[in-house]
Amino acid sequence: MANSRRTAAIIVAGGRGLRAGGGGPKQYRTLAGQPVIYRSMQPFCTHPDVFAVQPVTSPDDIALFEQAVAGLTHRPPANGGATRQQSVYSGLEALAKDAPDIVLIHDAARAFVDAALISRAIVAAQRTGAAVPTIPVTDTIKQVNGTNDVEATPDRATLRIAQTPQAFRYDVILEAHRRAAREGRDDFTDDAAIAEWAGLTVATFEGDAANMKLTTPEDFVREESRLAALLGDIRTGTGYDVHAFGDGDHVWLCGLKVPHNRGFLAHSDGDVGLHALVDAILGALADGDIGSHFPPTDPQWKGAASDKFLKYAIDRVHARGGRIANLEVTMICERPKIGPLREAMRERIAEITGLPVSRIAVKATTSERLGFTGREEGIAATACATIRLPWGPNGLSG
């Protein structure tokens, strides 16, 4: 991919978007808890080949903008104009002091752009100098007259739906905008149209059907439903386990053999951390508890390693088409000290479950010398598991 200093992005967010309803500019409304403009800017701000993101906003919306995109790295917003064309021109001029080679121009109302589409845009602009993402027209199109009578049926094989980000050599599109401003042309609805008017050949590259523009209240309702379906049925389960100390020189905790002056009194290896996690996962599935799946009266589990139990619980999630979102376990004991072992425990649980370490938390506390853990008679553990299951045909997960 090209050097990251070569490409900048303009995010056009100066419009009012009143057709979308909601009582304010649509780019500051939320979808699944995130502002639309955050969703549309974030992929550019984190793309390795985009060195600068130049937002364009209404001066009246600065406070809304700063709140909506908190945490993203971007240039100070340029002031938007009365039309989209004027807003883009403002963004182009704002980049002039540190001019990029390639500029991507993206509508803030397109909240589903992704890194792959951005990469395709950069490559297309490098290859052609002016390019627009498109998707095929699948409906039959009718051309009508002033009284809405059909005049023609264009061949849809020659038609495409244009999207953003549209990609250009910066110097070429800047000059096209400057010329349009000099000649009083402010009626272009996208930047590809300005490039065409200026005599440039505009290529196309593969767009993305999901990269739709949010325009009407119905668009927001539909996309909220779609995003909710993608999240699936989110469930949480909790678990608790305790084992008393007995004779021995080690204990098993979160999959690790930990030297200690006592051992556990247990049917299996007594790993309270993993047992609590197993119960939490089974609870999220509404699938009984560890004792119902691995009865302590069954001799086959005598001395069994608890990683088998955890793998079994994970397999139960996968068998229902689900996945683990997060696992958390809290160890409650005076000794052994958990702090020095915390990262090794996280890594061991990650190894057993196949999850990234970033989705596993291991915490520790004491009971302030109260109760059986305070008297060092044993160890307790609590756990929490968050899982996602797919929705079934009746709107419920299986």
Curated annotation (Swiss-Prot):
A GO BP entry: isopentenyl diphosphate biosynthetic process, methylerythritol 4-phosphate pathway
Presence of keyword Transferase: yes
Cofactor: a divalent metal cation
Binding site for 4-CDP-2-C-methyl-D-erythritol 2-phosphate: 241-243, 267-268, 289-291, 365-368, 372, 375
Reactions this protein catalyses: 2-C-methyl-D-erythritol 4-phosphate + CTP + H(+) = 4-CDP-2-C-methyl-D-erythritol + diphosphate; 4-CDP-2-C-methyl-D-erythritol 2-phosphate = 2-C-methyl-D-erythritol 2,4-cyclic diphosphate + CMP
Amino acids binding a divalent metal cation: 241, 243, 275
UniProt site positions, description: Transition state stabilizer: 19, 26, 267, 366
InterPro entries given in the database record: IspD, IspD/F, IspD/TarI, ISPD_synthase_CS, MECDP_synthase, MECDP_synthase_CS, MECDP_synthase_sf, Nucleotide-diphossugar_trans
Keyword terms: Isoprene biosynthesis, Lyase, Metal-binding, Multifunctional enzyme, Nucleotidyltransferase, Transferase
CDD domains (UniProt xref): CDP-ME_synthetase (cd02516), MECDP_synthase (cd00554)
One Pfam family here: IspD
A GO molecular function held by the record: metal ion binding
Pathways involved: Isoprenoid biosynthesis; isopentenyl diphosphate biosynthesis via DXP pathway; isopentenyl diphosphate from 1-deoxy-D-xylulose 5-phosphate: step 2/6; Isoprenoid biosynthesis; isopentenyl diphosphate biosynthesis via DXP pathway; isopentenyl diphosphate from 1-deoxy-D-xylulose 5-phosphate: step 4/6
EC code: 2.7.7.60, 4.6.1.12
Superkingdom of origin: Bacteria
Annotated family: In the N-terminal section; belongs to the IspD/TarI cytidylyltransferase family. IspD subfamily.
Function per UniProt: Bifunctional enzyme that catalyzes the formation of 4-diphosphocytidyl-2-C-methyl-D-erythritol from CTP and 2-C-methyl-D-erythritol 4-phosphate (MEP) (IspD), and catalyzes the conversion of 4-diphosphocytidyl-2-C-methyl-D-erythritol 2-phosphate (CDP-ME2P) to 2-C-methyl-D-erythritol 2,4-cyclodiphosphate (ME-CPP) with a corresponding release of cytidine 5-monophosphate (CMP) (IspF).
Protein name: Bifunctional enzyme IspD/IspF
Lineage: Bacteria, Pseudomonadati, Pseudomonadota, Alphaproteobacteria, Hyphomicrobiales
